[in-house]
């Protein structure tokens, strides 16, 4: 049985260190942080271990964006009026996600296994369907974002060996041009 009090207490302590206020809601699936608030779905006693791990990873990921070491990207995006739903903003967000995940897994080593589990789960659950099923959409923005997502898993695999298999399986669905992009990113860093 999940100790909800302990789970929420841990969430509140981590958020406070990052300067965030936690707001629990029933309908929010993943976390957002508009205006210094961490809005997160309230955990449920009916959740299984996998659901709790994904929730913990989402919470730690969003808090990670606000840790002092990586807090700079969101103010910059707002100042420059860069929308993360556009291709350029999405790519910047993916790059920052890598930086965020590496940093927060170093600051809070206990979050690393939830990150590995969640990455494997999301890829196998077709969270990004065009990556898992192959890139049927030939539009350049989608191809770039899909390649960046794949590359981000590859970068995380350097630190977490279990993700090597996930990266290899995701990479197989990319076309030759996308694979060349990945090879260039991995080679040139």
Where are these predicted regions, by residue range?
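Short, functionally important secondary-structure microenvironments
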Residues: 1-189
